[in-house]
């Protein structure tokens, strides 16, 4: 028997052997004689077969990999009997796989099964996840079941998306989105797109490699135009969004995100020769044109970035510069590259982060909303009689409140109300407001405290509010 700090095998029966790490049994998943998947301290791990070289290796790589910090497929060797005389060597691996719509389908199925078996409803399960940062015990088996089917996704990644599915505050970027007409693509839209592309390739008898080439080729415009029009009919996105997504996801360029010193030198030469013709530069450097553009703009063009603490003068200049831009371009998003030029050696990402940090401080420093204020805000939004949330005039609401709260503070508080009361799935924005108003008014009357009025009765008449 091997000592501690070793990955070892121990005889179990004549036909099988048990695998241990630091005297912790690796429990086999499925058929113990043929499986290459095990559970170690509650974590599913997988092994791939290689030639056996009779080398015993410390299991530290296994522990590191399970902790989520494995790099470049760190290797450990274990032993499992596959016959009476031959042994195999196994390599633990974890890919850094992007979260896909297929993973959402699997996770949502497992969540549905979990809720049925545990007899918890959605709200009760959400409350369990909110109470603690660690994974509650009832959810442990759910994560194990997911990783059995998708072993190359880390436990941490699954847990984050689990919290996102239940709309836990702070995990908004991991939330499940079925459909979205703008911004990040919804899971259902991506599944629809991938199915349609698979059918299209089969109909045209194109290989995967051919399809990648044709997406970026000028010689198959008619065929690709047919595909784009079909996707436009099926997916609630504009044609430009579909076109850009397809070219990002399906491209023949071999080089990805890593840049060497030689790659940067080559990019400088190409820009000197061809200017900002990023499509041409992308083809010549075998990279996505947008990757070339972004790397040039973010790392080469700015020169030496100023990373010192922001001075008071710089903060004031940043606020002034952004406000001037918004006044000149009220309907367009902020072009942070232009803001960065005015701030000299400040990176555009740093300018963006600092601006929103300063704005959020103004929001937090305003008077806190009380229950009566929340009801007042919902009623004012109902009075605006708009069909969608994006049509709300937050500046108008701020004026109604005599600027007690800024427009951004009103908007942020409304988002907080929706998350707190868990509003999802209502058909119209009007239904959402009515439902929120009803829920807020269900509280005891003595809690109806307001910054704007002495008591709730002071604004019970809607005609007297403005």
Curated annotation (Swiss-Prot):
SMART domains per record: SANT
DNA-binding feature ranges: 278-300, 336-359
Principal localisation: nucleus
A GO MF term: mating type region replication fork barrier binding
DNA-binding domain 2: annotated segments: 250-421
Subcellular compartments: Nucleus
CDD domains the record matches: SANT
Cellular component annotations (GO), alphabetically ordered: nucleus
Protein name: Replication termination factor 1
Organism: Schizosaccharomyces pombe (strain 972 / ATCC 24843)
